[in-house]
Design a protein with these regions (language model features):
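Non-heme di-metal
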Residues: 2-266
Length: 266
């Protein structure tokens, strides 16, 4: 158990979390419930994916306001994982063009976990019947350009890009977890589960919210921790030594925050 501060002078405290390296999941993780095997850099195959369950194949009965919250969370996270995939694709291309094998290898590891995230978020989006963002082509082009451009500037600039992006994403996942907490509590205290044949009273039936909601929160925590590991890698890789680090980080961070706001609705 650790408390991870986001790197930088004005960034908030990340919630307590248990960390395991995103590219070395040898045990089932929350996202494993969606039948997408976790990544493993160790010898041998990963654990077989479990069958789909109520938590991964159905959605809760929510008010319009509650569904809007879930829709905004899922839409922006799916778009964010798409953007991350294209940033790392661009970074790999730019680093390879410079002959920087070390950075290529590090980027490949982070990109692998982002592909896993995107595969899971696509299933979450389908489960909760959330319309994906309409701006996919734009995000793809902009994200690839950002990744490739910073990689062509040098290793430190590429790592500064990763640091800035993952800082914003880490904070954003925390914001989403805070927003989900009242929903988990309210659905647990008001909903009578028709799937519980042993519930004779309301008190018997309201022990927990629809299983998809705590699972979603656990998946967000897992992905947040993965993104913070990418942040660690970037800082250790010399992100803060990049020329114009403060300006570069500020511009990229502002762009990420603007993209989040747009994707929540569009």
């Amino acid at each position: 158990m650790s408390i991870r501060p986001i790197a930088g002078p004005s960034r908030r405290l990340i919630l307590p979390c248990t960390r395991s390296h995103s590219t070395a999941h040898s045990r089932p993780t929350p996202s494993h419930a969606y039948a997408v095997s976790p990544l493993s850099s160790r010898p041998g195959p990963p654990p077989p994916p479990p069958p789909r369950t109520e938590a991964t194949s159905s959605r809760p009965d929510l008010t319009p306001e509650q569904h809007d919250l879930i829709a905004r969370i899922v839409r922006v996270d799916q778009a964010g994982e798409l953007g991350a995939n294209w940033i790392y694709r661009g970074q790999k291309w730019g680093s390879a063009l410079r002959g920087d094998r070390k950075t290529v290898k590090e980027v490949e590891g982070m990109w692998a976990s982002e592909r896993h995230h995107l595969a899971v978020m696509k299933l979450v989006q389908q489960q909760h019947r959330v319309r994906p963002t309409l701006l996919y082509p734009l995000w793809q082009a902009m994200a690839f350009g950002l990744g490739a451009g910073t990689a062509l500037m040098g290793r430190e600039a590429a790592m500064a890009c990763t640091e800035a992006v993952e800082t914003v994403i880490g904070e954003h996942y925390d914001d989403q977890l805070r927003a989900l907490k009242p929903l988990l509590e309210s659905t647990a205290s008001t909903a009578v589960s028709p799937t519980n044949p042993n519930a004779n009273t309301v008190a018997d039936a309201v022990a927990a919210p629809h299983p998809s909601l705590p699972l979603l929160a656990s998946v967000l925590e897992e992905f947040r921790d993965d993104e913070l590991e990418h942040l660690d890698i970037a800082v250790e890789g010399g992100a803060q030594k990049a020329p114009g680090h403060s300006l570069l980080s500020a511009v990229i961070g502002f762009g990420c925050k603007a993209a989040i706001k747009v994707c929540e609705r569009v």
